[in-house]
Amino acid sequence: MSSHLPKFDLLVVGAGINGAGIARDAAGRGLKVLIVERGDIACGTSQWSTKLIHGGLRYLEQYEFRLVRESLAEREVVLRQAPHLVEPLLFVLPHEPHLRPAWLLRAGLFLYDHLGRRETLPRSFAVNLSKTPWGAGLKPTFGTGFVYADARVDDARLVVCNVMDAALHDADVRVHTALVSARRDHDGAGPFWRATLRDDAGVTSEATAKVLVNAAGNWVKRVREAINGVPSKESIRHVKGSHIIVPRVHEGTHAYILQNADKRIVFIIPYQDRYSLIGTTDVAMDGFEEPAISEQEVNYLLDLANTYLAQPLARSDVVWTYSGVRPLYDDGSADPSSITRDYVFKLDTDDGRGAAALSIYGGKITTYRKLAEHALQDLAPHLPSMPARWTANAVLPGGDLPPGGFGELLGELTGRYSRLPGEVVRGLAHRHGTTALSILGDAMAPSDLGEDFSQGLTAAEIDYLVDEEWARTGEDVLWRRTKCGLGMSKANRDRVDAYVARVARTLPVPA
């Protein structure tokens, strides 16, 4: 069975953070947008980040001043547009004189404070770790430290919210739908793309679009070569980053940034109240399918953490791990840690005769919005009369908080729904912001939310995730739309799988 979709201005391939951001920006400008994703939203690298919105302090050592400046500016923008998903976080950097001298750290932090616009976060400052709570959890031998501010984010939810906003601006969103083929064509109106799509049920669709955006992440080179029909000159470097989750290593709300003898840095970040997230590694990979952490990486992270922590961690303390492969533009660097994290665009037009295709290499979650603006700027000659950029001051769904910010929203929710479990209300507030009000509705008792799956996840939220956020499997719900899978028993995860499958079966098939 096959169907023909309406004509589009923009076909976006890939619903990671880059594709989601471009689809949102384009749809908000009034363009007709189709975004397709072979799996689930954020199912690739975007869900496996260190979960930070940051300027990239370490990139200063690699002289990536443009990237750091843009990242610092975008950090402020993302804090405003998704205040329920992004929150300020203070980082403590213990001084290790044999690794980097104090003057170098002060100079780097001075640049970090002044390179980009800072509206909400404080400047860096020095602290005495042995005599203040800033050193909580560290060995008493550490004396001097430096504190600076960045932010943390629920990475997968940020992607989902961008796709939701694209849909609110009339974008056509197709998950579990692969691009089978795409070829250039012409008619009286000019060049365009003719694409064939196939969903997981085997149903094919034909779509046409003026331009194509290849935001396929690790598959970007494959897609580019397939649609152009010739080998790509540019190469991609696959670099695996792995993280471990352990029980909370200190009671403070701050994070640690740890220096290692190999000149790399690793973060220890408070995670979901009960845990600490430790990462990341940088390992060059030949492939990128189903990455997994190695024992060597686990030991690397544990050994570095134990260099600093007063209470050493053992292998048995690791409760969960995750790995993602970053699709970085090959800039010729031999060291995986030195490869640029900046984004690179490649525009193909069949020597100016055919429809345009823009391929996206690299990029960071922090700069996704600016990447989207730059992508549409490059495509402007192929999309005449495109309206002006608009996302800098626009909040994402759920981000329209009251004047008192997230604290006021949480107070309003806990007061109105005082008879509901606090874990449920807090979780909905953090994941959905003001949209939590519509999910909770008139609920007066726990039974009004349907089945309870533990970890603050209820049937009412799952129904919303399936109906409004394209969740189709238990994995979509437990690890991307929420992070409730961590700490949930296998029996309850199985219950979630069964419930989602039952609810998703009732959804109408897209036209």
Task: Explain the meaning of each model-derived region.
Residues 141, 149, 155-158, 165, ...:
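C-terminal catalytic lobe of FAD-dependent flavoproteins
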Residues 175-193:
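A conserved short coil-to-beta-strand element within the FAD-binding core of flavoproteins
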Residues 4-18:
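Beta1/beta-strand and adjacent pyrophosphate-binding region of the FAD-binding site
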Residues 214-229:
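Flavin (primarily FAD) binding-site architecture
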